[in-house]
């Protein structure tokens, strides 16, 4: 099936398939409950349900899971399931993979996915996966992704997962400072990087990294646009207008809610289509 980009109204670069066909769920129950309480929304969609939801809205969705089995002891939705469903729904789903970087065979698995599947990028969640992105032990992973010409998306900033729990449910926020990803951007200048979310409490750091490193993008997922820090809106309207991306964090924030609030936010008219679609078209090589 040929992708009809003219039909697409927006590209959501940040959505989650939460459960697998046979019940896989990579998050601890208390983490999921805390995140849903924090966001006031939620749900546990399968990959098929993500596809149906976005098809109704004439949107494309980058979809992934978070593999953190060495931390949680729980299997996430299988990458193969996401890839299979995306292949059956190419008009709506763009599959990213998640590989727990702490797995002994992580780089081999990344290379296998690149070699044998239609994976379009990789998602990392340093808080949940408990790693510093700039730990050189993980550099072979980035090298493989860079060689393949695929993007790497990193969670940055605060995490709704664990919020409000004693000890944050064991989640350490230090892992998600975007300055750790700055090292990765320096050492892998050919690697396209997406800093996911407004990176509170390190918003200025994220802006600086993206401004300084030409291959670094920012996605706007996980927050309602009415709460965006003013400096983020200012740079999205000006120097970073070509590297800011629409993302919702579905199902924790729906694109319906995000887009309604985006319509009221202080973005320039000429910048809105860049954020909603055109920047992602370029990032993902859709044209």
Residue ranges and their predicted role:
Residues 26, 120-121, 134-245:
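Catalytic pocket-lining loop regions of alpha/beta-barrel enzymes
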Residues 15-17, 65-66, 97-101, 123-126, ...:
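A cross-domain feature marking catalytic cores of carbohydrate-active enzymes
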Residues 44-50, 77-83, 106-108, 178-181, ...:
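Alpha-helical scaffolding within the catalytic cores
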Residues 14, 82, 95, 113, ...:
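Conserved, mostly hydrophobic/aromatic
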Residues 17-21, 68-71, 101-105, 158-162, ...:
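Active-site environment of divalent metal-dependent phosphoester hydrolases
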Residues 60, 68-163, 172:
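Active-site gating/metal-coordination segments in enzymes
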Residues 1-16, 20-56, 60, 111, ...:
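Mid-to-C-terminal alpha-helical segments outside catalytic/metal-binding sites
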Residues 21-27, 75-76, 109, 164-167, ...:
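Short aromatic-enriched loop/helix-cap "lid" or pocket-rim segments at secondary-structure transitions
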